[in-house]
Amino acid sequence: SDFSDALAEYGIPLLVYTTALAPGFDFDALRNLKSVPPWNCNANCGNYQEIKRFAGTDPRLREFQTLWNAIHSEWMRRWGTKVRGWWVDGAYFADRMYAFPDEPNGRSFAQALRTGNPDAILAMNPGMVYPPRAVDPNQDYLAGEVNDPEYGLLHGPMIDGMQYHVLSYVGQNWGRGPA
């Protein structure tokens, strides 16, 4: 709340970072939230060999998704319109988790992220995908994670009718080297 208020003084909206799966190096969270799939999620978590002992049997992670939706709904009940949007990292497996007509799915996750602020915007990051694309019809803008920001700009401000956004690193690589 304080952070949002401080940003508002400068007309800067607060967008919040979250993840599609629970934090990959918090073993208690992985186990308790039942966030480890029976399929290799190494592209997302980077340590599947280490965490696969916590893997469940449901390929859609329905129990996890239900818990994750409830957590985000609770946050949004508290934060309300102070959160103007979300950037969801690690939505690399949207086809395995969200692309279903029955809940939990992409629609129910988007609803959870908009609890308290139905106008909150949403991007789901499929990783570095060229050309950039949406992974769920409930998102409002493209996550735009790129290694070469200029590559994405060649497509213009809109891709498939969706606002393009660029997220890249400063320095030599992601989290490494001088800026």
Predicted regions and their residues:
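Mature catalytic domains of secreted/periplasmic carbohydrate-active enzymes
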Residues: S1-A179
